[in-house]
Structures are given as structure tokens and as C-alpha cells.
């Protein structure tokens, strides 16, 4: 039998056509696919890598959550406490247990290195429940009624900020520059200031203020109570009718709930720019309430998690 050999040029054309077709399909899925599909593609093309930065020098001392709560509870009760921990200068991170995966260790170190003069605490599921039971017992029943631990973890982030101040950051995020001077400057004004970051997400504006980064110059900012109450109200309403399906955690205690709480607290945060083009944040215009600062996307979230941009991701790993 005689076989016909396809010319090399034809091979090249077929290869180019295949590459173009696959690229177009992938881009279409990234642009118009559902969020789970986009996330799966993002992870396959740009897997999560540990930071390539090697951190040397001092690291923020670590304290366990139980000790932190004990010290702040003593302060709240008016007892004298001799401690190096400064309210508003605490790095908070959370995981379901104390054994954070090794892939995140260098990212965690980035926060302890960048804020070496602060105090670091890692919260887990047991610590979160203890925090609610000790500091916010009136919400414990609602907390336990939430559908799962991820709802409770999101809820607890608001309480870290209200009870202790400082910065909360997801363990898969990296600190590349300090914000401590800004936080300290706001603390000097007297009223606590809340800090959040905007993201240009492709999903919807509802998801445009993630709770992966949250900061407070001092304990006691009322926004965090508004956000926590938003979740508590949902949990209590659902307790009357368990047939109500639970939406995703972002709607109950995550980013959507946070944005809704900001609107209830001070809608001007989302619409009032401060200064000119060189200023990268927005703030409340109502001087009678504790201020909220919303950083523009390039400060905290320079790229989105549901639509990768190769040139940005490449830059983060160089």
C-alpha cells in the first residue's frame, strides 16, 4: 500500500490552526464562562506558586490567639497589662488549623517581615469560636447556625478588626510594601479608620471589595460591627425557616456582605474620590462617623483572581 506524505507546510498550517482554535476557545471561556470554569482554567495555566522572595532580618513575633484574647480581655476589664502588643499593630491570618500548607509559608513570612515591629497571630476554627464566645457571646448562637466553617471564618475577620485592629490578610497573599505609616497617621487623628481594597473583578461589582485584605488603625471601628450584624441577621432569619437555601459564603459573610455593609454604613465610600489622579484611595465624606478608606485596585488588588493577565502574573514572579 502506498501512503501519501503530507507536506511539511501543511503540517505547520494544521499546527497553527490548532493553536489558534484552542487559544480562542480558552479566551472565550475566560471571558464568558462561569466563575468555576474560569477559576479552573486560571489554576491550570497559572498554578499557585510560593513567593520566590527570600526574607531575611527580623520577623514580627508570633503570639497564639488565646494569649491575645486574654490580654485584650484584661484591658477591656480595666486590669493592668504589661505587654509589647500595640492595638492596631497586629497581623491577623487564619486557617482551619495551625498547620498552614508549606506552599504558603514564604507568603506568611512576607507579612511578618514587612511588619516586623508588629505582632503576628494565626487564627484557626477553634480560636474563632472562642473569640465569639468570649467577646461577642450574644452572637454565638447565630455563629454556630452558619452553614459551614468558611462562613464562620469570613465572619470572624470582621471581629479581628473590631476587637484588635491591625491588618487581616489571606495566607495566599504577599506583602510587597508596608502600609504601617498610613495606619499610624490615621490612628493619630483619634477616631479609628478602616481600610479596604477595591478590585476590578469581571464577575460583578458586588464582588469588587474582597475581604482578603482588611485593616483598622485601632480597635472599635463601627463598620466591622455593621458587617458582622449583616451576617447575624441572615443567620437568625434562616433559623426560622431551614428550607431557605444558603447562598455562597461571599453573600452571607464575605465580599458581597462587606460591600452591602459599606453601603449601609456610608455609601460615599464607593463614590467620593479624594484628590487627583495621583491619589489611590477613596474615603468617607461624613466627618461625624469613623472614616473608611478604600484603596484603588492597583494598591491592594492589581489583578483579579478570575481573569488572569500573563504580563501581570509574570511580573509578580520576577
Question: Where is each model-derived feature located?
Answer:
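Glycosyltransferase-associated regions of secretory-pathway enzymes
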Residues: 2-153, 169-318
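Small-residue hinge/turn detector
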Residues: 154-166
Amino acid at each position: 500500500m502506498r501512503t501519501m506524505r503530507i507536506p511539511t507546510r501543511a503540517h505547520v498550517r494544521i499546527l497553527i490552526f490548532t493553536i489558534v482554535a484552542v487559544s480562542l476557545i480558552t479566551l472565550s471561556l475566560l471571558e464568558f464562562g462561569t466563575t468555576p470554569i474560569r477559576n479552573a482554567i486560571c489554576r491550570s495555566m497559572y498554578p499557585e506558586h510560593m513567593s520566590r522572595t527570600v526574607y531575611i532580618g527580623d520577623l514580627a513575633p508570633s503570639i497564639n490567639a488565646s494569649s491575645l484574647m486574654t490580654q485584650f480581655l484584661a484591658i477591656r476589664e480595666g486590669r493592668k497589662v504589661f505587654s509589647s502588643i500595640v492595638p492596631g499593630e497586629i497581623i491577623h491570618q487564619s486557617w482551619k488549623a495551625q498547620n498552614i500548607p508549606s506552599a504558603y509559608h514564604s507568603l506568611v513570612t512576607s507579612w511578618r517581615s514587612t511588619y516586623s515591629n508588629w505582632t503576628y497571630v494565626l487564627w484557626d476554627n477553634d480560636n474563632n469560636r472562642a473569640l465569639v464566645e468570649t467577646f461577642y457571646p450574644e452572637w454565638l448562637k447565630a455563629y454556630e447556625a452558619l452553614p459551614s466553617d468558611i462562613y464562620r471564618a469570613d465572619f470572624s475577620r470582621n471581629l479581628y478588626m473590631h476587637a484588635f485592629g491591625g491588618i487581616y490578610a489571606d495566607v495566599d497573599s504577599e506583602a510587597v510594601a508596608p502600609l504601617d505609616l498610613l495606619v499610624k497617621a490615621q490612628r493619630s487623628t483619634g477616631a479609628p479608620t478602616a481600610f479596604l481594597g477595591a478590585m476590578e473583578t469581571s464577575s460583578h461589582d458586588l464582588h469588587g471589595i474582597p475581604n482578603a485584605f482588611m485593616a483598622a488603625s485601632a480597635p472599635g471601628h463601627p463598620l466591622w460591627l455593621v458587617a458582622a450584624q449583616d451576617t447575624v441577621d441572615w443567620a437568625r432569619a434562616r433559623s426560622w425557616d431551614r428550607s431557605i437555601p444558603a447562598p455562597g459564603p461571599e453573600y452571607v459573610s464575605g465580599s458581597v456582605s462587606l460591600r452591602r455593609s459599606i453601603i449601609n454604613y456610608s455609601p460615599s465610600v464607593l463614590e467620593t474620590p479624594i484628590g487627583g489622579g495621583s491619589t489611590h484611595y477613596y474615603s468617607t465624606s461624613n466627618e461625624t462617623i469613623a472614616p473608611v478608606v478604600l484603596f484603588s485596585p492597583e494598591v491592594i488588588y492589581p489583578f483579579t483572581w478570575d481573569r488572569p493577565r500573563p504580563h501581570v502574573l509574570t511580573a509578580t514572579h520576577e
